[in-house]
A protein has these predicted regions:
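Short, well-ordered coil/turn elements that cap or connect secondary structure elements
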Residues: 11, 34-36, 63
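Class I S-adenosyl-L-methionine
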Residues: 26-29, 33, 77, 125
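Short glycine/proline-enriched coil/turn segments at helix->beta-strand junctions
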Residues: 36-38, 112-113
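Short, Lys/Arg-enriched N-terminal segments with co-localized hydrophobic residues
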Residues: 2-12
Length: 131
């Protein structure tokens, strides 16, 4: 299922950051489309989040930084991050995340007052009521 619909970036538009080959991202995209929620699509493999973006999203989310790591990914496992992350500072973790989009948990849904990491329909339902 190709990800083809891309809306022009507008101020206040929700950013949908995904990896198009990821089935969870495909389900999340379908959910956004089915709920008629406009978004700007960004391929995390081609356009990895910057340090500034990740820092802002992390601070806005209220989530532990570990939640931003794709713990089921091959790169995460090959780098043995399960054992290394507990010893790392937040700054070190953020700098590591920006090195490769495949380390970042996806999809990400980013809005003015919104940061959702991963796709859980129950958490995403609130945004469909705002649009």
């Amino acid at each position: 299922m190709p990800l083809t619909k891309v809306y022009l970036e507008r101020e206040n538009m929700i950013k949908f950051i995904c990896y198009p080959k990821c089935t969870t991202c495909q389900r999340a995209k379908k959910w956004l489309d089915d709920n008629k929620i406009e978004y700007e699509l960004r391929d995390i493999k081609l356009d990895n989040p910057t340090l500034e973006e990740l820092t802002e999203w992390y601070n806005k989310s209220g989530l532990p930084l570990k939640k931003f790591f794709n713990t089921s990914g091959l790169l995460y496992k090959s780098l043995d991050l399960k054992n290394k992350l507990p010893e790392m500072t937040e700054e070190e973790m953020l700098k590591l995340l920006v090195t490769d989009g495949m380390l970042v948990k996806r999809p990400l849904l980013i809005g003015d007052d919104l940061v959702l990491v991963g796709f859980k329909e129950t958490e995403w339902k609130d945004i469909s009521q705002q649009n």
